[in-house]
C-alpha cells in the first residue's frame, strides 16, 4: 500500500490539519476513557515539535448534522489536552473561513459533525477544510471506511494528503497479516451469528491455513458437522453455507463443549462431548479438550488474526475457552493482530495486551479491511500518493 507518510514530511511552518479519532466517552464534561486521545498524542506532539501550525479535529457522538449541541462538543477533549500537553490549547468553533494560529501552536476545531455536508462528503465543505491547510493528515483508522468530508473529501483537495503514524501502523500491521502472511496463518472469528460475519469468514477462508470459529458462530458449524446443538444460538439456514466453508478451508470443529440449561451468569458449566449435547442444552463455550487443541494450533502459528471471543467470556463459568485462546496467542512467537470491541475487552480481561503484536483501533474499519473491502480514506491517500 503506497501512501505518503506524515513522518517523512518537513512540517516546519506548515498549516497541518489532523483528522484524529477523538470520539471518546464523556460524562459531566469530563473524558471517562482516554485511550483514543492517548493514541493520538504522538502524532500531535510530532507536529508541534516540528514547528507546524497544528489543527486537530474529530467527530464525537452523533449530533444532528449542521446543529451545535453542547453535549457533543470537543471541549472536554480540549481540557484534557491542556493538561496532557501542559500548554494552552484553544477550541475554535467557527473555522470554515480560516483559522489564525502560530507555528508550534495547537488548536482543536469543533466537532466536524456540526458542519452540514460532513457525512455526505460534500465537495463545498471538503474544499473549505482543504483551504485551511498545507498538509492534511488522516490518522483516524476507525473512520477510514467512511467517505466523509473530513476523512476523504478534504484529502482530495488539500495540497498534500498523508497518513498519520497511527493509520500508517494500522495499515502495515493488517497488510502483514492479510497480504503476505508468514505461514501457518490462523484466523479466529468469534461472535454470535454467521450472518454478521459471513463476508469475513469467506474472505479469511481463502487466506488462512486454519480458520477457528467460536461463540454462536461455532454452533452453526457444529450443526453442520451433524451434531445436535440443543437450544443453542445457531442459524439453521446457514448450515449449508458452513458445510461449504468447511470443504474450502480447514475449520476445526469443537470435540467438547461447555453447556448449561439457561443463559445465566451463575449457571454451572457442564462439560460434554459434542455428540452428547441434549435437546435442552445451550452451548456457551469450548470444552477443555477443544481449547487445548486450538491452543496447540495457535502456539505453532506464524501469523494470527483474532476477531471475537469463542464463548460467553463475560460469565466466569464460561470464560475458559476465550482465556485459553488468549493465553495461547500471548505465548505464540508468531505475529498477532487483534481487533473488534469484544476482542479488546477479552484482551483487557485476561491481561495479554503487551503480548499481542498489534491491537487494531478500528471496529467497522478493521472488519471491512479483513473482508477485503477498499477503505475510502485509504484509497484517497493512495490516489494522492500517485498524483
UniProtKB/Swiss-Prot annotation:
Catalytic activity entry: (2R)-3-phosphoglycerate + ATP = (2R)-3-phospho-glyceroyl phosphate + ADP
A GO CC term attached to the entry: cytosol
Species of origin: Vibrio cholerae serotype O1 (strain ATCC 39315 / El Tor Inaba N16961)
Pfam families, alphabetized: PGK
HAMAP family in the record: Phosphoglyc_kinase
GO biological process, alphabetically ordered: gluconeogenesis; glycolytic process
Annotated InterPro entries: Phosphoglycerate_kinase, Phosphoglycerate_kinase_CS, Phosphoglycerate_kinase_N, Phosphoglycerate_kinase_sf
Subcellular location field: Cytoplasm
Subunit composition and interactions: Monomer.
GO molecular function per UniProt: ADP binding; ATP binding; phosphoglycerate kinase activity
This enzyme's EC code(s): 2.7.2.3
Annotated family: Belongs to the phosphoglycerate kinase family.
Protein name: Phosphoglycerate kinase
Binding-site residues for substrate, renumbered to this chain: 21-23, 36, 59-62, 113, 146
Pathway: Carbohydrate degradation; glycolysis; pyruvate from D-glyceraldehyde 3-phosphate: step 2/5
Binding site for ATP: 197, 314, 340-343
Enzyme class label: transferase
Keywords for this protein: ATP-binding, Cytoplasm, Glycolysis, Kinase, Nucleotide-binding, Transferase
Residue pairs linked by disulfide bridges in the UniProt entry: none
ATP-binding as UniProt keyword: yes
